[in-house]
């Protein structure tokens, strides 16, 4: 990864690689879905994958709102807060507001240190056939605050064309949750998700790539006595930055593979081990607008799930914005 360079007014249109460096300085961790209770989890494809999601490498604050839309279904039997349900259909839209701050001082051999927090607001409509009611369809719609994401550790080391990252998102059960209700905006358990990654950026060509590996560790849902298994997740991306108008466009692709590595457990895990997975690939489009010493970035991605087991299968639509100040 090239050495840090701050965006300037009149940035030369023939230097797209500078924008790769800028992207690394404008990123943050994402907030809060795999098998387990409800066929979902706190982590989801698209959260930490592209250059805009990398930990910051320059001091200052950042604001990062996001919009996430998901539509999925599952013909398999799924454990939920309303009991065992088949033929689930879910439609969720989430607005996430958050941001953080990066310190000027470095630690641990030159690591840039940042903290961040994100709070989602979700509208969810869900339906399915209840096993306890003999297959009768049940449904509900709910909206409200979701589970808060705290990121007390965001570390980034830069060395030439490479950046090495360590981040530790913590998902707190602050969202609305009721047993007996099919849909909830919160999951009612904690998740700690340590992640390590590496990113490459070529300052001459504008080519960038990133890969991040994490392990989501879940606690038990005290209301249902259900402990969702831990999830190993890999997110990768490749992007190319090109001059466009007064700024720069980036185009690329993102791929992921999430695998549950431990069984669901607890008195409420009536379906047994119930390990799940999801994998897919989708396009990523973005635009970077330099504004003197600041910059504004937009990113859109469509992430269809191509292979799933014991969970909902559908499509994620992400719209992210990052403003560095």
Feature names for model-found ranges:
Residues 1-44:
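Cleavable N-terminal export/targeting peptides
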Residues 39, 76, 83, 223-325:
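Outer membrane beta-barrel transmembrane domains
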Residues 50, 81-87, 134-140, 178-184, ...:
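Extracellular loop and loop/strand-boundary signature of outer-membrane beta-barrel proteins
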Residues 36-38, 52-60, 72, 103-113, ...:
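Short loop/turn motifs that connect adjacent beta-strands in outer-membrane beta-barrel proteins
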Residues 37-42, 70-94, 130-141, 182:
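Surface-exposed strand-loop-strand hairpins of Gram-negative outer-membrane beta-barrel proteins
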Residues 89-97, 111, 142-149, 186-192, ...:
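Residues that define the transmembrane beta-barrel architecture of outer-membrane proteins
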Residues 44, 61-71, 115-121, 166-172, ...:
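Transmembrane beta-barrel strands of outer-membrane/channel proteins
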Residues 65, 97-103, 150-156, 168, ...:
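Residues on the lipid-exposed face of transmembrane beta-strands in outer-membrane beta-barrel proteins
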């Amino acid at each position: 990864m090239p050495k840090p360079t701050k965006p300037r007014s009149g940035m030369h249109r023939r230097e797209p690689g500078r924008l790769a460096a800028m992207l690394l300085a404008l990123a943050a961790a994402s907030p809060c879905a795999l098998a387990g209770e409800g066929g979902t989890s706190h982590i989801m494809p698209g959260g930490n994958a592209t250059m805009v999601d990398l930990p910051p490498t320059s001091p200052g604050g950042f604001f990062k709102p996001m919009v996430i839309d998901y539509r999925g279904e599952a013909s398999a039997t799924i454990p939920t807060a309303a009991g065992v349900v088949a033929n689930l259909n879910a439609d969720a839209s989430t607005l996430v507001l958050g941001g953080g701050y990066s310190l000027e001082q470095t630690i641990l051999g030159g690591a840039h240190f940042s903290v961040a927090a994100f709070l989602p607001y979700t509208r969810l409509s869900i339906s399915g056939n209840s096993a306890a009611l003999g297959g009768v369809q049940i449904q509900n719609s709910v909206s409200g605050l979701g589970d808060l994401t705290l990121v007390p550790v965001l570390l980034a080391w830069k060395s030439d064309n490479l950046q090495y990252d360590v981040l530790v998102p913590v998902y707190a059960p602050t969202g609305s949750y009721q047993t007996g209700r099919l849909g909830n905006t919160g999951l009612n358990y904690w998740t700690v998700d340590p992640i390590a990654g590496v990113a490459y950026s070529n300052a001459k060509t504008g080519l960038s790539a990133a890969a991040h590996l994490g392990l989501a560790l879940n606690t038990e849902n005290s209301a249902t006595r259900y402990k969702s298994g831990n999830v190993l997740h890999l997110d990768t991306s490749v992007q190319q930055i090109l001059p466009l108008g007064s700024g720069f466009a980036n185009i690329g692709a993102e791929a992921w593979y999430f695998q549950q590595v431990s069984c669901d457990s607890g008195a409420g895990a009536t379906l047994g081990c119930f390990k799940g997975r999801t994998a897919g690939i989708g396009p990523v489009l973005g635009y970077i607008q330099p504004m003197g010493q600041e910059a504004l970035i937009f990113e859109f991605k469509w992430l269809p799930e191509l292979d799933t087991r014991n969970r909902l299968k559908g499509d994620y639509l992400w719209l992210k914005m990052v403003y560095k100040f």
